[in-house]
């Protein structure tokens, strides 16, 4: 499973924000500023392409009336304020994985940008800020790719790190001869971060209609108006796709997809994806599309010897969740531990409504925080939890988990499996 995760194409759904100073700097012209922002994202996408990551601009916001935070020359303070605004405002109205602020302010010292290390997919920390420090947009793009690199688990390069160029993307200082290349150290650090954190949000491919930037033929992502995209003509190896137009070649029905073979749709009924487990189903081609639609068993079907119920193709049970949090010997705690979820305190609750934690009702205690007993000699506490203020949802009982006979968790409540949940 780890290898499958590492090999999977990743997608960073980005929202780029420009502050009021940027709006003034570019002559109060939204068109000029938007064009600069699009150009920056195109370069960032080019840089991350080598890491098997596609950066898709799903939101662009220009603060043309006034700033929504107090942008100041202290980069630390500005990053903190921007990240809080992202969590409390932007995330609530726009689904995305990462937000970057492009500012016209001059940060103190030599700082050109700042971001949280390994923050991707975390509501509070998937953010960065970058100073528009140069007229040449590709130099600003490299600085933003550097900050996103931090979000994706990469630290600054040491002297021993190499990428085959004079300077690599994660170099600690800005170079007058920058490159679009990540060093061997960056690649190792990014891989180690993916293995450790396994961030899930970047696995989800954005819809072509989610992308707000103008389509770019040659960026390996099929956008509105395109039928295929195999990169630039010089590097395209796809015989089904015309790289110059991003249209299918004459006679081709498709260029990619699990139900596409040699530019033609596979026949109806051809298996395109085997069932992963008892809650999954083998997926079949329709003969009319290149897509392999994911099907799974109905929610509520018993699984794992009646210890759980199928939920969206998985079988979530508490023991597996304890093992994921505390290691292979972990077990679910006694029922008494789950009574802490009646308190409605910072960790013991069932759900959040408008950022307020709601205590569990007695019948719902198994749908709040998960309590585990890690079977190690050093552990005396029978009611262990995983709680981090950075990611409060981690360590909660997963949706669809069996909470009683014939019942499963849904939005912090223990509901009948036969009702839609």
Curated annotation (Swiss-Prot):
Gene Ontology process terms (BP): apoptotic process; proteolysis
S-S bridge residues: 121-201, 161-185, 163-168, 217-246, 228-241, 230-236, 240-263, 254-260, 259-285, 272-292, 279-310, 303-315, 322-372, 337-383, 350-360, 367-409, 403-414
Record's cofactor remark: Binds 1 zinc ion per subunit.
Disintegrin domain: residues covered: 214-299
Cofactors: Zn(2+)
Glycosylation sites: 312
Organs and tissues of expression: Expressed by the venom gland.
Major location category of this protein: secreted
Protein location: Secreted
Domain Peptidase M12B, residue spans: 10-206
Entry annotation: catalytic residues: 147
GO molecular function: metal ion binding; metalloendopeptidase activity; toxin activity
E.C. code: 3.4.24.-
Residues the entry annotates as binding Ca(2+) 1: 216, 219, 221, 223, 226, 229
Keywords: Apoptosis, Calcium, Cell adhesion impairing toxin, Disulfide bond, Fibrinogenolytic toxin, Glycoprotein, Hemorrhagic toxin, Hemostasis impairing toxin, Hydrolase, Metal-binding, Metalloprotease, Protease, Secreted, Toxin, Zinc
Binding positions for Zn(2+) per the UniProt entry: 146, 150, 156
Family matches, as Gene3D superfamilies: Collagenase (Catalytic Domain) (3.40.390.10), Disintegrin domain (4.10.70.10)
Pfam families linked: ADAM_CR, Disintegrin, Reprolysin
CDD domains xref list: ZnMc_adamalysin_II_like (cd04269)
GO cellular component: extracellular region; plasma membrane
Keyword Nucleotidyltransferase: no
Motif (D/ECD-tripeptide): 278-280
Subunit-level organization: Homodimer; disulfide-linked.
Annotated function: Snake venom zinc metalloprotease that induces apoptosis in vascular endothelial cells (VEC), without degrading the extracellular matrix (it cannot cleave collagen) or inhibiting adhesion of VEC. Has also fibrinogenolytic and hemorrhagic activities.
Family: Belongs to the venom metalloproteinase (M12B) family. P-III subfamily. P-IIIc sub-subfamily.
Name this protein carries in UniProt: Zinc metalloproteinase-disintegrin-like lachestatin-1
Species the sequence originates in: Lachesis muta rhombeata (Bushmaster)
Phylogenetic lineage: Eukaryota, Metazoa, Chordata, Craniata, Vertebrata
